């Protein structure tokens, strides 16, 4: 199926908060079920990249939806449960560090997005994807929106689902791999994480050997 990529919006003209305007415009064009799609975890040294697709019920949109990075952990958690209870459909997909190393983070992210869109229990008629890129082989048309999580409440909802899901995964990983502080930094390259890597070394299957600073030091693993 071909995909429509509209002219990307002016990122310097963001709304005060995400809204449902893009979705309403698409619904007027005949696209009833609009999926917002976002990712979390492109940059960390450890853990998966997680994507989510969310189709909101326009009559039950939770108050306060916003880019997950702009919300406190407590507010994200509250909205996470509100989205779970009110959305028409939610799908989550993740790809592990080893898969990221075998392809690259961009390809892995797009593949995870493709999987979560295709995994929606209510098939999407259209997808709004955060960022510049659109996955291939989608079951519906799609548009990429730069800073989409600050424009579309559907994308904002997806960012919250993906963020809370990934944080929970990394908290579980922290219980298994003691000493790395994964439950605190969730895999990002903090000073504490770098110090733990110096002390213990990376964990195969958890850490991304294709990412600096691991890439140069563990080049043999990647060969």
Curated annotation (Swiss-Prot):
Manganese or magnesium. Binds 1 divalent metal ion per monomer in the absence of substrate. May bind a second metal ion after substrate binding. Its main location: cytoplasm. One of its GO terms (cellular component) is ribonuclease H2 complex. A divalent metal cation binds at residues 38-39, 130. Its cofactor is Mn(2+); Mg(2+). Belongs to the RNase HII family. Endonuclease that specifically degrades the RNA of RNA-DNA hybrids. NCBIfam families: PRK00015.1-3. This is Ribonuclease HII. It comes from Bartonella henselae (strain ATCC 49882 / DSM 28221 / CCUG 30454 / Houston 1) (Rochalimaea henselae). The gene is rnhB.
